[in-house]
């Protein structure tokens, strides 16, 4: 029992790096989405209680989490050394996860624009979500984000 606990403690710092990176990447994704959307997301959520936008953003964050977990999930090799497991191979994996997730964030934002212009071209998704608070359109955007995150 104690041996298993000690083994967990040996790999704990390795996992902690991924947790911290995940939190920072979600904050980065929020900044990117604020930059690419023409409306103020926090204002829409706080003052207008926009459920449609809340659905869309939930799908956006879920899509990012799917990309991140997909990038992190790989065969785990426990090569613990004197540096608490922080080997050169480990840092290469961390950089790979970081780059993959940043590319995923960019692709998710481009996918929203493509769906707005090519798939849902008969109406403005921005107008439907921001002005009309159309929860159906918010759900469609959420589904697009999750689908792109899975791919």
Q: Which residues does each predicted region cover?
A:
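Transmembrane alpha-helical segments of integral membrane proteins
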Residues: 111-126
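Alpha-helical transmembrane segments
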Residues: 7-25, 92-107
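Mid-bilayer segments of alpha-helical transmembrane spans in multi-pass integral membrane proteins
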Residues: 97, 101-114, 140, 147-148
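Membrane-helix interface motif
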Residues: 32-36, 68-83, 114, 118
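Membrane-interface segments at loop-to-transmembrane junctions
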Residues: 42-56, 125-141
